Amino acid sequence: PGVEYLQRDEYEIDCEVFMTDNSGKYAALLWDPNRYINVFMYQFASGETADGVTLGISHFPYTPIDAYLEGTNLTNYPYITLSNLMYPYSISLNSKCAYESYILMTLSHELGHYLGLRHVFSEGDSESVCIDSDYCEDTPSYNREDYLRYMAWAGGNLSPEEYVAVRILREGCSGEQFVSVNVMDYNYGDQNRFTADQRSRVRHILRNSPLIPTERNARIQRSMLHDGPIDLPIVTMK
């Protein structure tokens, strides 16, 4: 592991553009992904979502056909090397939010994506539908859009003490109430726990996925490799 300081012409960088650039320009900055997890820190270009400022973004892993994991990117290549990449397979963190109260939580969350975990809240085509979309049965799901609307109301109608108390609560898809503690949720919550199903997904990625720093990928033989750039799907998560 190490730290490398890179001088760039841009002060702010659009994280979506950086992570999806397939020209090879940013891929040239990578250390070997089969030996390191690359984490870039730079100031994200201005822009907010319904959840506020983007704190981090990560690429989502691949799994080969013979070890496909539902919800990941399928690839025909069981082994992929740095020379095959044209985009910067990595994690990006927003340096504007690089203070301790956020950075550790953000890095943990993005590492979860990097190792195959999805958000615990409902993600589908319709905001009105609440579904379990993270492929983990032991993580309660909830409608985040409903939560954000309620928090907007609570901010103007509850006392500060009441607001702090309710913001860590979620209402699950089946109507149950629970405290948010999972790393793969967004603020607000404790965000310091994984579940058994999430652990199983991460272990599957560590055992089978290319571009992960594991003993499997450190022992790649020349006969297993594809020469030159590969056209790979680029999927990012925040």
Map each language-model feature to its residues.
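General "foldedness" signal
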Residues: D51-L55, D125-S126, I131, Y150, ...
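Charged, glycine/proline-rich intrinsically disordered loops and linkers
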Residues: L6-T20, V53-L85, T139-E171
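Detector for Asparagine
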Residues: N22, N34, N38, N73-N76, ...
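Extracellular low-complexity, Gly/Ser/Thr-rich intrinsically disordered linkers
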Residues: Y163-K238
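Acidic-enriched, low-complexity/disordered segments with a strong bias for Aspartate over Glutamate
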Residues: D9, D14, D21, D32, ...
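Propeptide-to-catalytic entry region of secreted or membrane-anchored zinc metalloproteases
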Residues: P1-I37, M41-A45, R207-T214, A218-K238
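The catalytic-center signature of Zn2+-dependent metalloproteases
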Residues: Y89-R193
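Active-site-proximal segment of zinc-dependent metalloprotease catalytic domains
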Residues: N22-S122
